[in-house]
Structures are given as structure tokens and as C-alpha cells.
Swiss-Prot record:
CDD domains: ASKHA_NBD_MreB-like. Gene3D superfamilies: 3.30.420.40. This is Cell shape-determining protein MreB. Forms polymers in the presence of ATP. Forms pairs of protofilaments that adopt an antiparallel arrangement and bind to lipids. It is found in: Cytoplasm. GO terms for cellular component: cytoplasm. InterPro entries: ATPase_NBD, MreB, MreB_MamK-like. It comes from Caulobacter vibrioides (strain NA1000 / CB15N) (Caulobacter crescentus). The gene is mreB. One of its GO terms (biological process) is regulation of cell shape.
């Protein structure tokens, strides 16, 4: 059944429909699209129409005039705005194929392991309405583990921690199945929110998402630097007291303080998962360690922070941002894998 569903060489694609970014893997070609999951809408006669999607739309975040808005249709790894998400998926699928009259693709989509039946159905229906012929769903930690090269088909335990924009997925896998999974709604977005809140509280400075993301990427760290303040960057925003633009300097230590809460939640999720892991699989994980994937895995010092709190070796995947999409793509390329990883989630 599964080989007949995705086995033919065609336009078949795998989609990592992330809160922050959407990646598309096309069968036989690899990753062909990586764009922000952002849509800009324009008000025309009381009706909202799509103005821009992806990279162009993200550049408009926080900068739109009154008759326009830039929004993220995905929140916490699931669809928050059904109609807008559908338009976004449709746009990306058409951009990938870039020609008229193509055969509608069969699609594999990643979903958070903690997604409800209603949330899974929303993703399934959005893809169908966007032009997919049939849709298969795969849990994100399974896709991340495959993309990171973990031996998920073997009778041995593997642990993956996938830190995305909206959620962190912690899972223990063995024999093509998920033995334990925990999905916590903390990820890159919560880190950005924590930085925005810190700047407001400690500097009376209002900054936007784009500036917060820049702070996270340039000096963000899971632990304060040993030599004091560490690197510093200048940040511009609006003074909350005077209402005028102002510039302040923020250090690595301050960034670590700002990120302490979301980092702590990720570490706690890992510890809870380890406590719930069966003894034999826990022994395997003690030998092989924990694999970090997702954009959040790039936060400096996060691997060391998890290692210090668990006593286990922690490895960041070679290409953490692409692991989920690559894992989906591997399933797409090798139909014999499908029964093991899609059977429980096929919609």
C-alpha cells in the first residue's frame, strides 16, 4: 500500500511545515525550497488577499501599513490560521514545480508528535486543498532522527531532541517506532519572546521579532560566558519612556539571562524523557548519547548545558536545520521504509 502510494517517480514532495520556516524536499532532487513560514495580506474592499509569501513577506514583519499585515499561519508547530496556511502551502508547491499542468503531487508532511487528531486533520486537509493528491503524516522526531542518521530501524534505543521554532520534540526511538515522546511548546519563537521581554524589563526598550532573532543568532547562548560579559552588539528600538528611537549595547551574559527560562524548559523536557525511558533503552542512550536537531540546536552552549544536566554525551547533527526535511525525503525516496514510519500516522 505504502509503496504504491509514493513509489512512482513523479512530483512527489516532502514538506517540513515549520513554525519559522518551511522546507520542501522533491523526490530525486533533494531540498528545493527553504523559506520563512510568513504570509503578507492586503485588505482589498474589506477582503484579505495574499500580497506576498515567504522571504518577501518576512521582510514586512512589523513594517506593514494599515491596510496590510504580515502573519505566521503556523503556531507551536500546528496550523493557527487554516485559510492562510492553505494559501501558503499552495504557493510553495507551485513555486517548486514552477510550471502549468503538472500532476498534483503526493505529499508527506511532518507534524509534532503531540499534535491532536484535529490538528493533524487540519494539516492533512490544508495540503489536499492546496493541490496534493494524497497526504501522509510523519511525526517530526521520527523524521529528525532519520535525517540525522540515527539507526531507528535497529533494536537499540536512540534519543533525538528536535528544537524547532514553535516546539521542542524529545523522543526515544527503536525498531522504527517511537517508544516515548514529549512535545513542549518552547522553541525559537519562545526564545525571541524571552529576549523581547528582557529588553523591555531591563532596558525599557521595545524591539521587534526581527531584532530579537538577530540578538539570538549573533550573541545568543545557553550559558553565561566564563570571562564575564562576552561579546556585545548594539541594538536599536523604541524607548518606552520617551517614545523615541534609542540604541543600547547588549552582551552575551545578558542574552544568556534572557534565554534562561526557555533553555531551562528544554533541559527539563529532556530529563523527564530520560526518566520515562525503559531501562534497556536507557542503557543504549547512555552509550550513544543524545542527538540535537532543529534550528534551536544551533544556540551556543545548549549541547553543553544538556550534557551537564544529564551526564550524557550530546551531539549536534551535521545539518540540524534540514534534518526533518531530509528525513522526510529519505522516506519519500525509499518506499520500503514507509510502513514502519507512516503506518501509525497516515491520514
Amino acid at each position: 500500500m505504502f509503496s504504491s502510494l509514493f513509489g512512482v517517480i513523479s512530483n512527489d514532495i516532502a514538506i517540513d511545515l515549520g513554525t519559522a520556516n518551511t522546507l520542501i524536499y522533491q523526490k530525486g532532487k533533494g531540498i528545493v525550497l527553504n523559506e520563512p513560514s510568513v504570509v503578507a495580506l492586503r485588505n482589498v474592499g474589506g477582503r484579505k488577499v495574499v500580497h506576498a509569501v515567504g522571504i518577501e513577506a518576512k521582510q514586512m514583519l512589523g513594517r506593514t501599513p494599515g491596510h496590510m499585515e504580515a502573519i505566521r499561519p503556523m503556531r507551536d508547530g500546528v496550523i493557527a490560521d487554516f485559510e492562510v496556511a492553505e494559501e501558503m502551502i499552495k504557493y510553495f508547491i507551485r513555486k517548486v514545480h514552477n510550471r502549468k499542468g503538472f500532476v498534483n503531487p503526493k505529499v508527506i508532511v511532518c507534524v509534532p508528535s503531540g499534535a491532536t487528531a484535529v490538528e493533524r486533520r487540519a494539516i492533512n486537509d490544508s495540503c489536499l486543498n492546496a493541490g496534493a493528491r494524497r497526504v501522509g503524516l510523519i511525526d517530526e522526531p521520527m523524521a529528525a532522527a532519520i535525517g540525522a542518521g540515527l539507526p531507528i530501524h535497529e533494536p537499540t534505543g536512540s534519543m533525538v531532541v528536535d528544537i524547532g521554532g514553535g516546539t521542542t520534540e524529545v523522543a526515544v526511538l527503536s525498531l522504527s517506532g517511537i517508544v516515548y515522546s514529549r512535545s513542549v511548546r518552547v522553541g525559537g519563537d519562545k526564545m525571541d519572546e524571552a529576549i523581547i521581554s528582557y529588553m523591555r524589563r531591563h532596558h525599557n526598550l521595545l524591539i521587534g521579532e526581527t531584532t530579537a532573532e538577530r540578538i539570538k543568532k549573533e550573541i545568543g547562548t545557553a550559558r553565561a560566558p566564563a570571562d564575564g560579559e562576552g561579546l556585545s552588539i548594539d541594538v536599536k528600538g523604541r524607548d518606552l519612556m520617551q517614545g523615541v528611537p534609542r540604541e543600547v549595547r547588549i552582551s552575551e551574559k545578558q542574552a544568556a539571562d534572557a534565554l534562561a527560562e526557555p533553555v531551562g524548559q528544554i533541559v527539563e523536557a529532556v530529563k523527564v524523557a530520560l526518566e520515562a525511558t525503559p531501562p534497556e533503552l536507557a542503557s543504549d542512550i547512555a552509550d550513544k548519547g543524545i542527538m540535537l536537531t532543529g534550528g534551536g540546536a544551533l544556540l551556543r552552549g545548549l549541547d553543553a548545558e544538556i550534557r551537564d544536566h544529564t551526564g550524557l554525551p550530546v551531539t549536534v547533527a551535521d545539518d540540524p536545520l534540514s534534518c526533518v526535511a531530509l528525513g522526510c525525503g529519505k522516506v519519500l525516496e525509499h518506499p520500503k521504509w514507509m510502513k514502519g514510519v507512516l503506518e501509525s500516522t497516515l491520514a
